[in-house]
């Protein structure tokens, strides 16, 4: 059984440690509840005590990637509006015969839900930025939100795979702002799955969830490598 902290030790506690202590009661191990290392926290806690939060670094990753994604979507929306006003307009994303977005904007592949994909993406990235800022505030997410984040990330990766295949087989071109969106979707997905698993929200065994958290950077690198190799193989001869 853990000992009660002294008054002096309580006075020296940080605000976060004090909140944990007051919420845990005297029978819980204070040092265990305030560990910042996710791997140690995962191994030490029983499932019902696991936090549904994450390190602040994950909050920063979500926020920064979301803001970059919003900017890329905004550029695509602006390009589509320019094209609607003037079909012969020179778009900023039409860099070369290989790197261009004009052909993909006003076709059905660029408007899957009846509105521009970039508009849907901007909404999704806006929600992602909000989640990132919530995590930066130190709050913990409920399980349903982790499920939504994991499912949304899976949908994002599915869209990357689909639109990459369309770019290769249908357009024969690469949209630069789309590639920016792909580049931020990949780390969001890899880290979201890892932290959701670490929080016990994906139903994985403890040791497997810890392994997923440890290799999240490798998962991200593998997805980047798959995209790069696909592009090189498809367009390497052009």
Feature locations, PLM:
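N-terminal signal-anchor transmembrane alpha helix
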Residues: 54-84
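Interfacial helix-loop-helix junctions of multi-pass membrane proteins
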Residues: 75, 79-90, 158-185, 234-238
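Membrane-interface loop-to-helix entry segments
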Residues: 105-127, 174-186
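Hydrophobic alpha-helical transmembrane segments
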Residues: 115-138, 155, 159
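Final/C-terminal transmembrane alpha-helix of multipass membrane proteins
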Residues: 214-238
């Amino acid at each position: 059984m853990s000992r009660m902290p002294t008054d002096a030790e309580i006075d020296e506690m940080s605000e976060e440690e004090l909140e944990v202590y007051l919420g845990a009661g005297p029978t819980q191990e204070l040092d265990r509840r305030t560990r910042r290392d996710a791997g140690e926290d995962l191994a030490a806690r029983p499932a019902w005590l696991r936090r549904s939060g994450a390190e602040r670094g994950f909050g920063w990753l979500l926020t920064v990637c979301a803001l970059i994604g919003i900017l890329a979507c905004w550029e695509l929306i602006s390009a589509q509006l320019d094209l609607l006003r003037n079909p012969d307009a020179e778009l900023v994303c039409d860099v070369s015969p290989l790197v261009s977005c004009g052909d993909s904007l006003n076709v059905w592949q660029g408007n899957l839900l009846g509105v521009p994909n970039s508009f849907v993406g901007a909404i999704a990235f806006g929600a992602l930025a909000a989640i990132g800022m919530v995590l930066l505030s130190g709050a913990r997410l409920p399980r349903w939100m982790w499920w939504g984040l994991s499912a949304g990330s899976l949908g994002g990766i599915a869209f990357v795979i689909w639109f990459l295949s369309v770019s290769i087989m249908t357009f024969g071109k690469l949209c630069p702002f789309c590639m920016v969106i792909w580049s931020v979707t990949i780390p969001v997905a890899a880290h979201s799955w890892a932290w959701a698993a670490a929080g016990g929200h994906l139903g994985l065994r403890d040791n497997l969830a810890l392994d997923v958290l440890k290799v999240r950077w490798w998962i991200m690198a593998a997805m980047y490598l798959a995209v790069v190799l696909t592009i090189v193989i498809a367009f390497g001869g052009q």
